């Protein structure tokens, strides 16, 4: 917390402060509360929402790790509105009041829907103002009732209550908060955030964030999610810091309640952006926002890159719906496809696609390899049969698109080849009428898979 305060008290004069926002129209919420809330959710989603500690030999555990275990294990997760536990890959494990991006799987391990789980409400006077933990679960509006039935089917004897929040009660917004690079917004937001080890600390941080950026309107903020799915890309400046903000229905434009004078002589410029712009930015990096963007139960969570996200999936959390295949994939490392962004040369040709099935993507690289492999089959009676041409395997499938940017699930061997030989993947989408549309997977959008590629190459050499 001290570093966060120190940062905001030492900002120098600048002009590149921007707050850009967009209304998100298709979201609905289910409100969940009760002493078993976290235990209940932990058995349904891919994120690890409560810590479990394995006893270790005292000579193998560090003092720092032991202190962290002692602090987190002493928390009572069934009492008061303490927030949400985040077990991270790059950040330290911590308690937060910012939401968690997660997934609900079917019994076969396929993604039913992605979701955001928010501690609710975002700000309070004290965590003891509420007797039990309380959360909002965000879903696309068209599946909210189905997910409510799913929750009801799994409730059994769990001490939880949930109900669908009427759509007119809440409003959802996407917002970018950007500042000049020298002010290190990410470091000074994430560093103090990961220091929060109990509910009161997390609440103090949330209250400070709300008063800094929404002074005088803190009570209108009901939930906040800081999109940390691709932290490394944010640090490299490829992705702008994105926030999903849920307000009450009194807010007609979130720009009106944003505190543009938070830094005194450095006022924020405020602007509205379109949902199209935001979706295209996400698609570049293979990111989804609700199952209206893909066909439910067609993707594995790891194919959707959940293992690259900060706190969205965990390999050792124990039992949850769909856990068996996911755990096996983690253990064996056998995963054949990944979701990536693509560029599309003539997107108007896709206008009649009804999205009921993914469209096959073929790569010119595959055709070259297969043409070399085509050979005559040997006839045991002495004559040669006609050459047998292998069936061309798709390099991947187009999942969705917006204008000239799409998101596709692509075979990893193509991704690895592109990274190894430093080239884009030139390909084409095949329409149902066999017409083709040229597309390309940009090398710059594949950087995050480089370490995975190198690790698998080492394993193959051994």
From Swiss-Prot:
Q: Give a GO cellular-component term.
A: mitochondrial matrix
Molecular function terms from GO:
transferase activity
- What residue range does the UniProt record give for the transit peptide? 1-15
The source's domain of life comes to: Eukaryota
This chain belongs to the protein called: Iron-sulfur cluster assembly factor IBA57 homolog, mitochondrial
Q: Which family does it belong to?
A: Belongs to the GcvT family. CAF17/IBA57 subfamily.
Q: Which organism is it from?
A: Kluyveromyces lactis (strain ATCC 8585 / CBS 2359 / DSM 70799 / NBRC 1267 / NRRL Y-1140 / WM37) (Yeast)
Checking InterPro entries in the record gives: TrmE/GcvT_dom1, YgfZ/GcvT, YgfZ/GcvT_CS
Fetch the NCBIfam families from UniProt.
ygfZ_signature
Cellular location of this protein? Mitochondrion matrix
**Gene Ontology biological process:** iron-sulfur cluster assembly
Alphabetical keyword list: Mitochondrion, Transit peptide
Query: What residue ranges carry the coiled-coil annotation?
Result: none
């Amino acid at each position: 917390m001290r570093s966060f305060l120190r940062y905001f008290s030492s900002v120098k004069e600048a002009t590149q402060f921007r707050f850009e926002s967009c209304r998100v129209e298709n979201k609905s919420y289910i409100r969940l509360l009760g002493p078993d809330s976290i235990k209940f959710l932990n058995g349904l989603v891919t994120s690890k929402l409560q810590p479990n500690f394995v006893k270790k030999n005292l000579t193998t555990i560090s003092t720092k790790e032991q202190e962290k275990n002692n602090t987190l294990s002493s928390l009572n997760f069934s009492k008061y509105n303490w927030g949400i536990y985040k077990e991270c890959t790059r950040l330290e494990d911590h308690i937060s009041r910012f939401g968690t991006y997660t997934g609900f799987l079917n019994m076969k391990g396929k993604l039913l829907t992605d979701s955001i789980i928010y501690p609710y409400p975002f700000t309070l006077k004290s965590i003891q103002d509420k007797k039990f933990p309380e959360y909002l679960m965000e879903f696309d509006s068209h599946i909210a009732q189905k997910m409510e039935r799913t929750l009801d089917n799994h409730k059994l004897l769990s001490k939880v209550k949930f109900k669908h929040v009427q759509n007119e009660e809440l409003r959802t917004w996407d917002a970018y908060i950007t500042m000049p690079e020298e002010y290190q917004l990410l470091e000074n937001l994430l560093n103090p955030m990961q220091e929060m080890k109990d509910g009161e600390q997390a609440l103090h941080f949330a209250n400070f964030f709300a008063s800094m950026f929404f002074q005088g309107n803190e009570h209108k903020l009901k939930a906040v999610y800081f999109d940390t799915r691709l932290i490394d890309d944010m640090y490299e400046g490829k992705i702008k810091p994105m926030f999903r903000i849920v307000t009450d229905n009194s807010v007609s434009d979130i720009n009106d309640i944003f505190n543009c004078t938070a830094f005194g002589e450095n006022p924020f410029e405020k602007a509205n952006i379109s949902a199209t712009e935001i979706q295209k930015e996400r698609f570049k990096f293979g990111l989804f926002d609700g199952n209206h963007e893909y066909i439910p139960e067609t993707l594995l969570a790891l194919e959707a890159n959940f293992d690259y996200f900060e706190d969205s999936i965990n390999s050792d959390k124990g039992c949850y719906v769909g856990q068996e295949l996911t755990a096996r994939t983690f253990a064996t490392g056998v995963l054949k496809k990944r979701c990536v962004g693509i560029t599309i040369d003539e997107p108007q040709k896709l206008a009649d696609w009804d999205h009921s099935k993914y469209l096959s993507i073929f790569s010119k690289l595959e055709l070259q390899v297969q043409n070399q492999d085509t050979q005559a089959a040997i006839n045991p009676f002495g004559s040669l049969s006609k050459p047998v041409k292998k069936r061309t395997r798709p390099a991947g499938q187009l999942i969705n698109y917006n204008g000239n940017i799409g998101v596709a699930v692509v075979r990893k061997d193509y991704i690895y080849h592109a990274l190894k030989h430093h080239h884009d993947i030139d390909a084409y989408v095949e329409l149902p009428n066999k017409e083709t549309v040229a597309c390309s997977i940009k090398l710059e959008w594949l950087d995050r898979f480089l370490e995975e590629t190198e690790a698998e190459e080492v394993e193959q050499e051994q």
